[in-house]
From Swiss-Prot:
Chain residues that bind S-adenosyl-L-methionine: 36, 55, 76, 120
Source organism (scientific name): Pseudomonas savastanoi pv. phaseolicola (strain 1448A / Race 6) (Pseudomonas syringae pv. phaseolicola (strain 1448A / Race 6))
UniProt protein name: Ubiquinone biosynthesis O-methyltransferase
Function in brief: O-methyltransferase that catalyzes the 2 O-methylation steps in the ubiquinone biosynthetic pathway.
Domain of life of the source: Bacteria
Length: 232
């Protein structure tokens, strides 16, 4: 059985044409992207690395990593976002290979092929996040690193990521997130360790509605990223 939620894909299919509009529903992704790319680049040195971006959507992260000198492949199950990603790279001149395939199927094809695997803002949109994490482990080379980001599951996250972002500040379309699918850092850490990955670092992202800016922080109460290592 495929680890795909068609309803989740449909949400992003409907908005795909707005993916690269920095004032659209995807503004939060554009706003946090430099912070995320810098954080990853500081830890792995993207230049010259072979990178897989799992759940790449319209290619915002994929292109940013390619601009840092990485050879990037982006995979997603949304046909429309991938079409947007492919069109955008024609405009930008940034080279990324895009494929419509699940992480699990890609792991069958490409085991131990990547220096770095990224899976950002994707785990909370699939039925079985642990299956994706295991696939990421299989695709990264021994000694390589895997980065995940998602949203914590607690009252604060519900208030900020659902009520605040979707209903008050209108940063995201209503219904973008399902609180039940949010993932606690302890759960993500346990799934990562069960897959064979060693957790190296955890960082939070917070949003200030007054300045409309995001920043990296030790507060992992809402949005957070983790760095993991597959030991050599």
């Amino acid at each position: 059985m495929s680890n795909v939620d068609r309803a989740e894909i449909a949400k992003f299919e409907a908005l795909a044409h707005r993916w690269w509009d920095r004032e659209s529903e995807f503004k939060p992704l554009h706003d946090i992207n430099p912070l995320r790319v810098n954080w990853i680049d500081e830890r792995v040195g993207l230049a010259g690395k072979k990178v897989l971006d799992v759940g790449c959507g319209g290619g915002i992260l994929s292109e940013a990593m390619a601009l840092r000198g990485a050879t990037v492949t982006g995979i997603d199950m949304g046909e429309a976002p991938l079409a947007v990603a492919q069109l955008h790279q024609l405009e930008s001149g940034v080279s990324v290979e895009y494929r419509q395939i699940t992480a699990e199927d890609m792991a069958e094809e490409m085991p131990e092929q990547y220096d770095v695997v990224t899976c950002l803002e994707m785990l909370e949109h699939v039925p079985d996040p642990s299956s994706v994490i295991r696939a990421c482990y299989r695709m990264v080379k021994p000694g390589g690193q895997v980065f995940f980001s998602t949203i914590n599951r607690n009252p604060k996250a519900y208030l900020f990521a659902v009520v605040g972002a979707e209903y008050i500040l209108n940063l995201l379309p209503r219904g973008t997130h399902d609180f039940k699918k949010f993932i606690r850092p302890s759960e993500l850490g346990a799934w990562s360790r069960d897959a064979g990955l060693q957790v190296k670092d955890v960082i939070g992202l917070t949003y200030n509605p007054l300045t409309k800016h995001y920043k990296l922080t030790s507060d992992v109460g809402v949005n957070y990223m983790i760095q993991t290592l597959r030991e050599a």
